[in-house]
Structure formats: structure tokens, C-alpha cells
Amino acid sequence: MEKEFKDIVCQILKNSNFIKMDESIHHGNVSTYKHSLLVAYLSYLFVKKHNLKNIDIYSLIRGAMLHDYYLYDWHKKKEGHRFHGFRHPYFALKNALKVFPDLNKKERNIILRHMWPLTIIPPRYKEAWIVQYCDKKATFHDYFSKKKRIKK
């Protein structure tokens, strides 16, 4: 991984709640921790590969890292986690603001709008569009990782 990317994610990777996300499965056999890191890295690579200008890399990566910072096992429907796909962006933002109260408007928008079109309101910023695209790409990766595991 590039130094620029590592320098931005290091503060978040040290957070104890973020570390605990490695214990909860997101999709397939991939933890929420690994999924979030993958989304952030794919978003970073997307910007670099396409040589996009006027992208706030710092906000892009931080928003991507925190987009699924909801801190619960969404598979446990009986614990009140119904409609997870619609609701978790709000829980993720609420939790992220407790630890990172300095989140800017782009980072907040990335977290809140990454589930578009499921959550109806589209992203507002280029950075949020990139993250929501890379989140879908990472989810397919997570899903097919599960399929590979089953075939073995």
C-alpha cells in the first residue's frame, strides 16, 4: 500500500472499536474491518488509476473507512437490526462522530449516502460517488470470496 494511503488510515486503524470490527462478518467470510479497508483502498486506487483531479483524497479515504462503522452484528435480526441496509448509514455516522467529531461534510455524506440507490437520496460529492461504487465492487468481492470458500 502507498504511504499516502497508510498515513490517512493509521489513525482509524488504531481505534479500538474499529479493531473489533474484525470480529464481525460483513458479507461472505469477510469481516467489516477488512471490507471497510478494501473499500477505502479500492476508492484510492480508482482515483489514481483514472487520474481524477480535484478529489479530496483525505476525505475519500476517511469516509470510506467509516462507511460501515455501525458496530453491531447485522445478521442478528432479533436484536433490532432489521432493515439494516436502509438504517446502518445513520448508525455508522452517529458512531463515527463520537470518535471523530471533526468529520467534514464530504466524509459525512460518504457515510450517509454509500447505500444509494437503496437509500433513495444520492451522494452529493464526487468522493461519495466513488465510495458508493467501490463499496458495491467490494461487496461482490466479499460474496465471491464466500463462494470460493464453499467450493473448497
Q: Could you tell me what each predicted segment is?
A:
Residues 1-152:
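Metal-dependent phosphohydrolase cores
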